[in-house]
Structures are given as C-alpha cells and as structure tokens.
UniProtKB/Swiss-Prot annotation:
ATP binds at A69, Q70, S71, G72, T73, G74, K75, T76. The Q motif is unique to and characteristic of the DEAD box family of RNA helicases and controls ATP binding and hydrolysis. The lineage of its organism: Eukaryota, Fungi, Dikarya, Ascomycota, Pezizomycotina. It is found in: Nucleus, Nucleolus. It comes from Aspergillus terreus (strain NIH 2624 / FGSC A1156). It is an enzyme of class 3 (hydrolase). It catalyses: ATP + H2O = ADP + phosphate + H(+). Belongs to the DEAD box helicase family. DDX48/FAL1 subfamily. This is ATP-dependent RNA helicase fal1. Keywords: ATP-binding, Helicase, Hydrolase, Nucleotide-binding, Nucleus, Ribosome biogenesis, RNA-binding, rRNA processing. The gene is fal1.
Amino acid sequence: MADGIDRRADDRMEFNTSKEVTVAPTFEDMHLKESLLRGIYAYGYESPSAVQSRAIVQICKGRDTIAQAQSGTGKTATFAISILQVIDTVVRESQALVLSPTRELATQIQSVIMALGDYMNVQCHACIGGTNIGEDIRKLDYGQHVVSGTPGRVADMIRRRHLRTRHIKMLVLDEADELLNRGFREQIYDVYRYLPPATQVVVVSATLPYDVLDMTTKFMTDPVRVLVKRDELTLEGIKQYFIAVEKEEWKFDTLCDLYDTLTITQAVIFCNTRRKVDWLTDKMREANFTVSSMHGEMPQKERDSIMQDFRQGNSRVLISTDVWARGIDVQQVSLVINYDLPTNRENYIHRIGRSGRFGRKGVAINFVTSDDVRILRDIELYYSTQIDEMPMNVADLLS
C-alpha cells in the first residue's frame, strides 16, 4: 500500500488476456532504463501491480495494446512508464501523445510522467483547453518529448503546426470509453490523421463497452489485450447503498439530514448538470453548510484552485458534475453521494471509484426517486453488483 496501489485484489483479478502476455513480477524483469527505474522507486513503487506486470512489456515491445483495469490499480503509471522507456530524450521532439477526456486528468498525467521521469531530463507539457494558447505555443516550439492533453486543444496545436507529429511513435487514449463517446470521437480522428502511419496505439480504461472495443479495430493492428472481465469491475471495499427519496424535491432535505448524522473526512456529491451543481451549492450555503463546487464551464484557473483546495483538505465537500469523476486522485475521499444517478451507466464506476481509492474503505450513497428505480436496477445488472437500502447506522460505516 505504500506505493498507492491496492494490491489486495490483484490475486483475485480475472485477466481475460491475450495468450502471448507474460507476467513480469518485478520492474527489473522489464529491462527498463536505469534512470527510469530510479524514478519508479523514488516515486514509491516497489513492485508492479497486476496490470503493470502484464501490459508494460507488451507496450515497450511496440505492440498496440488495450489495457483495462479498475481505478487504483496503477493504470496511469502503466502507460507513463512505457512512454518513458521508448522515448529518446536526446531528440527534442514530441514522441508520445496522451489524450484524456478532462483537463484535470491531462494535467495529472503530466505530473506523473514528470515525476517518474525525474532522472531522465524529460520534457512533458499539458496541452489543455481553457489555458493561454501563447504558453502552449512557447512550450511546444521549445520541444516536448511527451504531450498530455485534451483532444480539442491538441488537434488545434497540430493544425497550427506548433505540435509537430513526424516523430510521434505512440498515441495513448486514456479513459477511452469517455473519449470515444460521440463528443470526442471526431477530434480523436482529427488527431490520428496527422500521426505517422506506424504510430503505436494504446487504449487504457476502467470500462470498455463493446462498441468502444469494436471502434478500436479502426486504428489498432492486432492489439494485445489485458482485460479484466467486466463483471469483476465493481470496486472492492466500496459499500454501495441507495436511499429511496420518492420525489426529486425531497433530495435536498435528505442530504441535509445526512450531514447531521455523518462526520465526513471528505465527500463528493455528483449532479448531472452544471445548473444543478450551481443550484445545490447555493441552497447548501443558504442552509449554512460549507461546500465548494466545480463543473466544466468554470474558467480553468478557478477549477485548478478548487481542486487544489480539495486536495489539500481545505474544503471538505465538493459538489461536481462528471468532469470530476474520471481518474482524479484525492485519497482522503471516503464518501460519494450520487445526488443524481449518472445518465451514462459507465460513469457509475468512475464516480464511486472516488471513494475508497487505493484500498481505503469508502461508501457510495445513491439518491433514488421513483423514476430512478429502473436506472439503479440497470446499474446493478451491468456491474453484477447489489446496491442495498442504506442502514440506519451509516455513520459507523465511515468510522
């Protein structure tokens, strides 16, 4: 646990994996660069997690790879280590490109790559919307070995010829299920069209719906697969409950009642729309509860500041849309409340994955109106899980 990965589930994970994949029990067995190994150990890793021990060697061999594993299993480091192994830092050109669905995730990936590559003199830039284009241009013109970004800004920088693609050898799609939803699909194709024909493609995600797997055939050649069977994906250590609220109007009072009974370390409350986030934030503040909020239409600086406050524990309760749900590491979060059930059932695992990350116990509570019962049952079926009615002693579950 010292290295931030929950390994207790590793032995029980079912890997629906290509036959040619072997397991590398140590990082030394992967034959990584000495400078990279130093960075890995300095970062706090001692031995590879289940997904790392299977996927890194395949990616470093140049194979197109689909890697699927739950939150908290070290997915980000899987491709970060692989990228750092294959790039040549002597060549000051972009050699690997990582696309993520949110700005926060792209920035976090950049910081992981910089930390793991601390002894390699690696240049990695976060190329994201909502930031100063001039800064992007300056950094890209200087030369970046790795670019971690969101599809829109990356496509724009390629079109403007500031992000040069001729040396790119690897494209990573992180949280591919979200990226390949309709909103990002065209932008990914825009980026892909500019890449050299032999570019290696790596797809990483906690959930890979069948239509996404089908779509990857369009830009992957004979990919190696490291897949956890879908029914294994509900996160261990997360207790999942629902509260029947009958009507939408009753949710607010239910939330206030919960605040009175729960002593919370940190909690995230998810709503489905920006408008609902703003409305609930105002209503909670009127009732003298201290909350912060975040959604995708806030200026980037404001989002960064809110994230930093929450990471440092200065704010304890964050109300957010799904912009926050994917891959953001805040280890103190012990409670997630789905004020609204997610409209996309695949987002459910990303939301509740916020609580109990890295083996910490967590509780997820779903507010369910009469109209939501069908959606809740659909989520239970999809993940082969059971979501029980919340018991009276819920405060004990968090202690």
